[in-house]
């Protein structure tokens, strides 16, 4: 009987010792895991605070440290700046070294050599089909032309705002717009858009669904058209699909790393009257000079004031990003 009791006590003591050993081992392992996790967290925090190498790494543009914008005449580290200008500008200047000269002038305003990019486009209409705004800050120079005033306004609305867009299959489906921020945006070499509003029985309102000629034309031979129809009503859409695409888009808000500078014209284009523009601020400015050298000199002089009303953003804009931005 005593042998059985001694055996039971011995087994109990061994179990306690074994359990104590297991608990100490688990504690050491947990301490190791926790300390490693804290070390990695501190290291990542230091890196992401030092430079923009973290999870929000920009798709394009520089990875320079972000500095507060300043209007003071002191040199500070900046990010990339893209300057978009029409072919007319380089033709009038007619100087093979004009970009290098301007780069040196930007350097005096705090923009290091190599941080300013000059991008030429042929005309407003062609530029609107495939805008490529890749820099941290983007300035688009638009020469005012009364005959292109509406095209300029639509382009400004496109590039000064962010849009979430999805493709539309107008051959199979009817579409309706859900609110003021919902627009259809068509792009291509030649876009002619016609619509036929439908009642609840899918019969045409003032048009015949089987007769395209009876549809209402809302865009003709355009390269960019932002289409707005009556909300909450289905529409049958006819489109020149061989030369144009159309997307169902929702305006998300201002694209704050883009500004438009209008060259000439009696009045600056105003897109803030659009109820979907919120907040009611615009990054559009006007300079009145006949010579392009004078235009560029003015931009260099006021570049830091211009950038101050902008905000560095990580999103880029090209035709693909515009159509499928997530």
Swiss-Prot record:
Q: Which GO terms describe its molecular function?
A: metal ion binding
Domain of life, per lineage? Viruses
Cystine connections: 82-135, 165-249, 191-244, 196-207
Q: Which UniProt keywords apply?
A: Calcium, Capsid protein, Disulfide bond, Glycoprotein, Host endoplasmic reticulum, Host-virus interaction, Metal-binding, Outer capsid protein, Signal, T=13 icosahedral capsid protein, Virion
Q: A Pfam family for this UniProt protein?
A: VP7
Summarize the PTM comment. Answer: Intramolecular disulfide bonds. N-glycosylated.
Q: Which residues are glycosylated?
A: 69, 238
Query: What GO cellular component entries does it have?
Result: host cell endoplasmic reticulum lumen; T=13 icosahedral viral capsid; viral outer capsid
Q: Where does Ca(2+) 1 bind?
A: 95, 206, 214, 216
Compartments annotated for it: namely: Virion; Host endoplasmic reticulum lumen
Misc. comment: Some rotavirus strains are neuraminidase-sensitive and require sialic acid to attach to the cell surface. Some rotavirus strains are integrin-dependent. Some rotavirus strains depend on ganglioside for their entry into the host cell. Hsp70 also seems to be involved in the entry of some strains.
Q: How does it assemble?
A: Homotrimer; disulfide-linked. 2 Ca(2+) ions bound at each subunit interface in the trimer hold the trimer together. Interacts with the intermediate capsid protein VP6. Interacts with the outer capsid protein VP5*.
Q: What does this protein do?
A: Calcium-binding protein that interacts with rotavirus cell receptors once the initial attachment by VP4 has been achieved. Rotavirus attachment and entry into the host cell probably involves multiple sequential contacts between the outer capsid proteins VP4 and VP7, and the cell receptors. Following entry into the host cell, low intracellular or intravesicular Ca(2+) concentration probably causes the calcium-stabilized VP7 trimers to dissociate from the virion. This step is probably necessary for the membrane-disrupting entry step and the release of VP4, which is locked onto the virion by VP7.
Q: What is this protein called?
A: Outer capsid glycoprotein VP7
């Amino acid at each position: 009987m005593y042998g059985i009791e001694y055996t039971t006590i011995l087994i109990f003591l061994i179990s306690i010792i074994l359990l104590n050993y297991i608990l100490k081992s688990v504690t050491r392992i947990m301490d190791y895991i926790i300390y490693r996790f804290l070390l990695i967290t501190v290291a990542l925090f230091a890196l992401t605070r030092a430079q923009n190498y973290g999870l929000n790494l920009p798709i394009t543009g520089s990875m320079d440290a972000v500095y507060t914008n300043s209007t003071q005449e002191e040199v500070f580290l900046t990010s990339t700046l893209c300057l978009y200008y029409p072919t007319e500008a380089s033709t009038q200047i007619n100087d093979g070294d004009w970009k290098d000269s301007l780069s040196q002038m930007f350097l005096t305003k705090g923009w290091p050599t190599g941080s300013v990019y000059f991008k030429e486009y042929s005309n407003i209409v062609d530029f609107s089909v495939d805008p490529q705004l890749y820099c941290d800050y983007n300035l688009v120079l638009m020469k005012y032309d009364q005959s292109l005033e509406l095209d300029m306004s639509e382009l400004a609305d496109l590039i000064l705002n962010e849009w979430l867009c999805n493709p539309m299959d107008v051959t199979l489906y009817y579409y309706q717009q859900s609110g003021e921020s919902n627009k259809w945006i068509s792009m291509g070499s030649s876009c002619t858009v016609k619509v036929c509003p439908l009642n609840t029985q899918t019969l045409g309102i003032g048009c015949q669904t089987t007769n395209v000629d009876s549809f209402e034309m809302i865009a003709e031979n355009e390269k960019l058209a932002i289409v707005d129809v009556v909300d909450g009503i289905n529409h049958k859409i006819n489109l020149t699909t061989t030369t144009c695409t159309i997307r169902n888009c929702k305006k998300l808000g201002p694209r704050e790393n883009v500004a438009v500078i209008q060259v000439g014209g009696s009045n600056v284009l105003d897109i803030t009257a659009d109820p979907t523009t919120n907040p009611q601020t615009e990054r559009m400015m006007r300079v009145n000079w006949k010579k392009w050298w004078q235009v560029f000199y003015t931009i260099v002089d006021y570049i830091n004031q211009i950038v101050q009303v902008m905000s560095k953003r990580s999103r880029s804009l090209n035709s693909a990003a515009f159509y499928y931005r997530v």
